[in-house]
Amino acid sequence: MGRKRKGRDISGWLVVDKPAGLTSTAVVNKVRWAFDAKKAGHAGTLDPEATGVLAVALGEATKTVPFITDAMKAYTFTVTLGAATNTDDAEGEVIATSAERPTDDDIKEALLGFIGEIQQVPPKFSAVKIDGQRAYKLARDGEEVELSARPLWVEELVMLDRPDADHVVLEMTCGKGGYVRSIARDLGEKLGCLGHVRELRRIWSGPFDAEDGVTLEQIDALAKSPEIDQFLRPLEEGLADLPELKCTPQGATRLRNGNPGMVIASDVEYGEEAWASLEGKAVAVGTFKAGELHPSRVFNQD
Protein backbone atom coordinates (compact mmCIF):
# COMPACT_ATOMS: atom_id res chain seq x y z
CA MET A 1 0.00 0.00 0.00
CA GLY A 2 1.40 3.41 -0.98
CA ARG A 3 2.37 5.93 1.62
CA LYS A 4 -0.35 8.49 2.34
CA ARG A 5 0.56 11.94 1.12
CA LYS A 6 0.69 14.57 3.85
CA GLY A 7 -0.93 17.98 3.63
CA ARG A 8 -4.23 19.71 3.05
CA ASP A 9 -6.82 18.78 0.45
CA ILE A 10 -6.80 22.29 -0.97
CA SER A 11 -7.59 23.07 -4.61
CA GLY A 12 -7.17 26.13 -6.80
CA TRP A 13 -4.74 28.18 -8.86
CA LEU A 14 -2.01 30.46 -7.56
CA VAL A 15 -0.60 32.93 -10.07
CA VAL A 16 2.99 33.61 -9.06
CA ASP A 17 5.03 36.49 -10.45
CA LYS A 18 8.25 34.48 -10.58
CA PRO A 19 11.49 36.35 -9.85
CA ALA A 20 14.74 35.71 -11.71
CA GLY A 21 17.15 33.19 -10.26
CA LEU A 22 14.74 30.38 -9.34
CA THR A 23 13.67 27.28 -11.23
CA SER A 24 9.97 26.69 -11.80
CA THR A 25 10.21 23.52 -9.70
CA ALA A 26 11.66 25.47 -6.77
CA VAL A 27 8.72 27.88 -6.91
CA VAL A 28 6.20 25.01 -6.96
CA ASN A 29 7.92 23.40 -3.97
CA LYS A 30 7.75 26.68 -2.03
CA VAL A 31 4.06 27.09 -2.84
CA ARG A 32 3.29 23.51 -1.81
CA TRP A 33 5.10 24.09 1.49
CA ALA A 34 3.47 27.48 2.15
CA PHE A 35 -0.05 26.15 1.55
CA ASP A 36 0.69 22.77 3.16
CA ALA A 37 -0.86 21.28 0.02
CA LYS A 38 -0.93 17.58 -0.76
CA LYS A 39 -0.45 18.11 -4.47
CA ALA A 40 0.95 20.89 -6.66
CA GLY A 41 2.17 21.39 -10.22
CA HIS A 42 2.74 24.19 -12.73
CA ALA A 43 1.43 24.94 -16.21
CA GLY A 44 4.51 25.74 -18.27
CA THR A 45 8.17 26.00 -17.29
CA LEU A 46 9.95 29.35 -17.15
CA ASP A 47 13.74 29.43 -17.47
CA PRO A 48 15.47 30.19 -14.14
CA GLU A 49 16.41 33.74 -15.17
CA ALA A 50 12.98 34.49 -16.65
CA THR A 51 10.31 36.35 -14.69
CA GLY A 52 6.54 36.64 -14.84
CA VAL A 53 3.53 34.33 -14.81
CA LEU A 54 4.06 30.90 -13.34
CA ALA A 55 0.62 29.38 -12.83
CA VAL A 56 0.73 26.87 -9.97
CA ALA A 57 -2.13 24.39 -9.56
CA LEU A 58 -3.02 22.85 -6.20
CA GLY A 59 -5.05 19.71 -5.57
CA GLU A 60 -7.88 19.10 -8.02
CA ALA A 61 -6.75 22.09 -10.12
CA THR A 62 -3.80 19.97 -11.31
CA LYS A 63 -6.34 18.18 -13.51
CA THR A 64 -6.82 21.44 -15.45
CA VAL A 65 -3.08 22.02 -16.05
CA PRO A 66 -3.17 20.74 -19.68
CA PHE A 67 -5.69 23.42 -20.62
CA ILE A 68 -3.37 26.22 -19.41
CA THR A 69 -0.33 24.53 -20.94
CA ASP A 70 -2.15 24.49 -24.29
CA ALA A 71 -3.38 28.10 -23.99
CA MET A 72 -1.88 31.14 -25.73
CA LYS A 73 0.90 32.96 -23.88
CA ALA A 74 2.60 36.35 -24.23
CA TYR A 75 6.17 37.40 -23.53
CA THR A 76 8.23 40.57 -23.56
CA PHE A 77 11.93 40.05 -24.07
CA THR A 78 15.12 41.89 -24.85
CA VAL A 79 17.41 40.53 -27.56
CA THR A 80 21.12 41.34 -27.49
CA LEU A 81 22.32 41.75 -31.07
CA GLY A 82 25.84 40.97 -32.25
CA ALA A 83 26.54 37.80 -30.26
CA ALA A 84 25.38 34.18 -30.20
CA THR A 85 25.68 32.00 -27.09
CA ASN A 86 25.58 28.23 -26.66
CA THR A 87 22.39 28.52 -24.57
CA ASP A 88 20.76 31.26 -26.69
CA ASP A 89 20.53 33.46 -23.59
CA ALA A 90 22.84 35.61 -21.47
CA GLU A 91 23.71 32.70 -19.15
CA GLY A 92 25.70 30.88 -21.81
CA GLU A 93 29.14 31.25 -23.37
CA VAL A 94 29.57 33.53 -26.37
CA ILE A 95 30.33 31.29 -29.36
CA ALA A 96 30.25 33.87 -32.17
CA THR A 97 30.10 37.63 -32.65
CA SER A 98 29.20 40.05 -35.43
CA ALA A 99 29.81 43.73 -36.04
CA GLU A 100 26.65 43.99 -38.17
CA ARG A 101 23.73 45.96 -36.73
CA PRO A 102 20.30 46.10 -38.39
CA THR A 103 18.14 49.19 -38.70
CA ASP A 104 14.74 49.36 -37.02
CA ASP A 105 13.09 48.80 -40.39
CA ASP A 106 15.27 45.74 -41.00
CA ILE A 107 14.08 44.27 -37.69
CA LYS A 108 10.39 45.03 -38.31
CA GLU A 109 10.56 43.44 -41.75
CA ALA A 110 12.35 40.35 -40.41
CA LEU A 111 9.75 39.89 -37.67
CA LEU A 112 7.04 39.38 -40.29
CA GLY A 113 8.66 36.07 -41.20
CA PHE A 114 8.06 34.74 -37.69
CA ILE A 115 4.29 35.27 -37.63
CA GLY A 116 1.80 32.48 -38.27
CA GLU A 117 2.73 28.80 -38.28
CA ILE A 118 6.53 28.52 -38.19
CA GLN A 119 9.01 25.68 -37.75
CA GLN A 120 11.20 26.16 -34.69
CA VAL A 121 14.24 24.21 -33.48
CA PRO A 122 14.40 24.22 -29.65
CA PRO A 123 17.61 25.43 -27.97
CA LYS A 124 20.23 22.74 -27.36
CA PHE A 125 20.06 23.66 -23.68
CA SER A 126 16.39 22.75 -23.23
CA ALA A 127 14.30 20.07 -21.53
CA VAL A 128 13.43 18.37 -24.83
CA LYS A 129 14.13 14.65 -24.62
CA ILE A 130 16.49 12.83 -27.00
CA ASP A 131 16.37 9.04 -26.63
CA GLY A 132 15.02 9.46 -23.11
CA GLN A 133 17.59 12.04 -21.99
CA ARG A 134 17.16 15.80 -21.58
CA ALA A 135 18.92 17.79 -24.29
CA TYR A 136 20.53 20.16 -21.77
CA LYS A 137 22.18 17.25 -19.94
CA LEU A 138 23.68 15.94 -23.17
CA ALA A 139 24.82 19.46 -24.12
CA ARG A 140 26.43 19.98 -20.70
CA ASP A 141 28.34 16.73 -21.17
CA GLY A 142 29.75 18.07 -24.41
CA GLU A 143 27.75 15.79 -26.68
CA GLU A 144 26.57 17.04 -30.06
CA VAL A 145 22.84 17.71 -29.81
CA GLU A 146 20.62 17.57 -32.90
CA LEU A 147 17.03 18.64 -32.35
CA SER A 148 14.23 18.46 -34.90
CA ALA A 149 12.17 21.47 -35.86
CA ARG A 150 8.62 21.55 -34.52
CA PRO A 151 5.61 23.67 -35.44
CA LEU A 152 4.75 26.77 -33.42
CA TRP A 153 1.86 29.18 -33.88
CA VAL A 154 2.93 32.81 -33.43
CA GLU A 155 -0.07 35.12 -33.19
CA GLU A 156 1.92 38.34 -32.91
CA LEU A 157 5.57 39.46 -32.77
CA VAL A 158 6.26 43.19 -32.59
CA MET A 159 9.08 45.55 -31.72
CA LEU A 160 8.36 47.59 -28.59
CA ASP A 161 11.62 49.51 -28.23
CA ARG A 162 15.16 49.90 -29.57
CA PRO A 163 17.09 51.30 -26.58
CA ASP A 164 20.40 51.20 -28.48
CA ALA A 165 22.05 49.60 -31.50
CA ASP A 166 22.88 46.44 -29.54
CA HIS A 167 19.42 45.71 -28.13
CA VAL A 168 15.80 45.38 -29.23
CA VAL A 169 12.74 44.81 -27.04
CA LEU A 170 10.05 42.55 -28.50
CA GLU A 171 6.63 41.23 -27.52
CA MET A 172 5.36 37.85 -28.72
CA THR A 173 2.04 36.06 -28.39
CA CYS A 174 2.28 32.38 -29.24
CA GLY A 175 0.82 28.92 -28.70
CA LYS A 176 2.07 25.89 -26.85
CA GLY A 177 5.73 24.88 -26.94
CA GLY A 178 7.34 28.15 -27.99
CA TYR A 179 10.96 28.91 -27.12
CA VAL A 180 11.69 32.63 -26.93
CA ARG A 181 15.41 31.85 -26.98
CA SER A 182 14.97 30.19 -30.38
CA ILE A 183 13.16 33.27 -31.70
CA ALA A 184 16.08 35.48 -30.58
CA ARG A 185 18.63 33.10 -32.11
CA ASP A 186 16.78 32.74 -35.42
CA LEU A 187 16.04 36.47 -35.68
CA GLY A 188 19.73 37.25 -35.17
CA GLU A 189 20.67 34.78 -37.88
CA LYS A 190 18.05 36.16 -40.28
CA LEU A 191 19.34 39.70 -39.72
CA GLY A 192 22.94 38.55 -40.20
CA CYS A 193 24.02 39.94 -36.84
CA LEU A 194 23.43 36.99 -34.44
CA GLY A 195 21.45 37.35 -31.22
CA HIS A 196 20.43 35.93 -27.87
CA VAL A 197 17.91 36.66 -25.10
CA ARG A 198 19.06 39.09 -22.45
CA GLU A 199 15.84 39.40 -20.41
CA LEU A 200 12.55 37.51 -20.60
CA ARG A 201 9.18 38.03 -18.92
CA ARG A 202 5.94 36.09 -19.41
CA ILE A 203 3.24 38.74 -19.15
CA TRP A 204 0.25 36.41 -19.42
CA SER A 205 -0.60 32.75 -19.80
CA GLY A 206 -4.16 31.83 -20.76
CA PRO A 207 -6.44 33.65 -18.29
CA PHE A 208 -3.61 34.57 -15.90
CA ASP A 209 -1.80 37.95 -15.95
CA ALA A 210 1.55 38.81 -14.38
CA GLU A 211 0.12 42.04 -12.97
CA ASP A 212 -2.25 39.91 -10.86
CA GLY A 213 0.56 37.64 -9.71
CA VAL A 214 1.62 37.05 -6.12
CA THR A 215 5.26 37.61 -5.16
CA LEU A 216 7.36 35.13 -3.20
CA GLU A 217 7.65 37.77 -0.48
CA GLN A 218 3.86 37.77 -0.11
CA ILE A 219 3.84 33.99 0.02
CA ASP A 220 6.60 33.90 2.64
CA ALA A 221 4.81 36.49 4.78
CA LEU A 222 1.62 34.40 5.04
CA ALA A 223 3.06 30.89 4.72
CA LYS A 224 1.28 28.22 6.78
CA SER A 225 -1.39 30.71 7.91
CA PRO A 226 -5.12 30.65 7.05
CA GLU A 227 -4.75 34.08 5.42
CA ILE A 228 -2.64 32.67 2.58
CA ASP A 229 -5.74 31.08 1.05
CA GLN A 230 -6.89 34.56 -0.04
CA PHE A 231 -4.43 34.32 -2.94
CA LEU A 232 -6.02 31.16 -4.37
CA ARG A 233 -8.16 31.38 -7.48
CA PRO A 234 -10.88 28.84 -8.35
CA LEU A 235 -9.81 25.78 -10.30
CA GLU A 236 -12.58 26.70 -12.77
CA GLU A 237 -10.34 29.52 -14.08
CA GLY A 238 -8.15 26.82 -15.58
CA LEU A 239 -11.08 25.86 -17.81
CA ALA A 240 -11.62 29.36 -19.22
CA ASP A 241 -10.98 28.28 -22.82
CA LEU A 242 -13.65 25.54 -22.74
CA PRO A 243 -17.42 26.03 -22.93
CA GLU A 244 -19.29 25.55 -19.65
CA LEU A 245 -22.38 23.34 -19.46
CA LYS A 246 -24.82 23.31 -16.54
CA CYS A 247 -25.79 19.94 -15.14
CA THR A 248 -28.49 18.71 -12.78
CA PRO A 249 -27.69 17.16 -9.39
CA GLN A 250 -28.53 13.77 -10.89
CA GLY A 251 -26.24 14.43 -13.85
CA ALA A 252 -23.47 15.55 -11.50
CA THR A 253 -23.73 12.30 -9.53
CA ARG A 254 -23.40 10.25 -12.71
CA LEU A 255 -20.45 12.33 -13.90
CA ARG A 256 -18.65 12.01 -10.57
CA ASN A 257 -18.99 8.25 -10.88
CA GLY A 258 -17.37 8.40 -14.31
CA ASN A 259 -20.59 7.91 -16.29
CA PRO A 260 -22.14 10.16 -18.96
CA GLY A 261 -24.34 12.80 -17.35
CA MET A 262 -27.13 14.97 -18.72
CA VAL A 263 -26.19 18.62 -19.32
CA ILE A 264 -27.95 21.73 -20.61
CA ALA A 265 -26.30 22.88 -23.84
CA SER A 266 -27.14 25.42 -26.52
CA ASP A 267 -24.04 26.52 -28.44
CA VAL A 268 -21.91 23.39 -27.99
CA GLU A 269 -21.43 21.08 -30.95
CA TYR A 270 -21.48 17.29 -30.92
CA GLY A 271 -18.01 15.96 -30.07
CA GLU A 272 -16.78 19.26 -28.62
CA GLU A 273 -14.76 19.28 -25.40
CA ALA A 274 -16.51 21.11 -22.54
CA TRP A 275 -16.89 21.14 -18.78
CA ALA A 276 -19.94 20.60 -16.61
CA SER A 277 -20.76 22.65 -13.53
CA LEU A 278 -23.22 22.46 -10.68
CA GLU A 279 -23.83 25.67 -8.73
CA GLY A 280 -20.68 27.19 -10.24
CA LYS A 281 -18.37 24.32 -9.26
CA ALA A 282 -16.65 22.19 -11.90
CA VAL A 283 -17.86 18.60 -11.89
CA ALA A 284 -16.11 17.12 -14.92
CA VAL A 285 -14.43 17.76 -18.26
CA GLY A 286 -15.39 15.62 -21.20
CA THR A 287 -16.90 15.31 -24.65
CA PHE A 288 -20.43 16.54 -25.41
CA LYS A 289 -22.62 13.99 -27.19
CA ALA A 290 -26.39 14.07 -27.65
CA GLY A 291 -27.30 15.99 -24.51
CA GLU A 292 -24.73 14.29 -22.29
CA LEU A 293 -21.16 14.96 -21.23
CA HIS A 294 -18.92 11.91 -21.45
CA PRO A 295 -16.30 12.59 -18.75
CA SER A 296 -12.53 12.34 -19.23
CA ARG A 297 -11.61 14.13 -15.98
CA VAL A 298 -13.73 14.25 -12.83
CA PHE A 299 -13.27 16.79 -10.03
CA ASN A 300 -13.71 15.86 -6.38
CA GLN A 301 -14.95 19.11 -4.87
CA ASP A 302 -17.15 19.62 -1.84
Curated annotation (Swiss-Prot):
Active site as annotated: 47
GO molecular function terms noted in the UniProt entry: RNA binding; tRNA pseudouridine(55) synthase activity
Record's protein name: tRNA pseudouridine synthase B
Keyword tRNA processing listed: yes
InterPro entries: PsdUridine_synth_cat_dom_sf (IPR020103), PsdUridine_synth_N (IPR002501), tRNA_psdUridine_synth_TruB (IPR014780), TruB_C (IPR032819)
GO terms under biological process: mRNA pseudouridine synthesis; tRNA pseudouridine synthesis
Chain's role: Responsible for synthesis of pseudouridine from uracil-55 in the psi GC loop of transfer RNAs.
Protein's organism: Ruegeria sp. (strain TM1040)
Enzyme Commission number(s) of this protein: 5.4.99.25
Family: Belongs to the pseudouridine synthase TruB family. Type 1 subfamily.
Enzyme class: isomerase
Keywords associated with the record: Isomerase, tRNA processing
Keyword Isomerase among UniProt keywords: yes
Pfam families referenced in this protein's UniProt entry, alphabetically: TruB_C_2 (PF16198), TruB_N (PF01509)
Annotated HAMAP family: TruB_bact
Catalysed reactions, semicolon-separated: uridine(55) in tRNA = pseudouridine(55) in tRNA
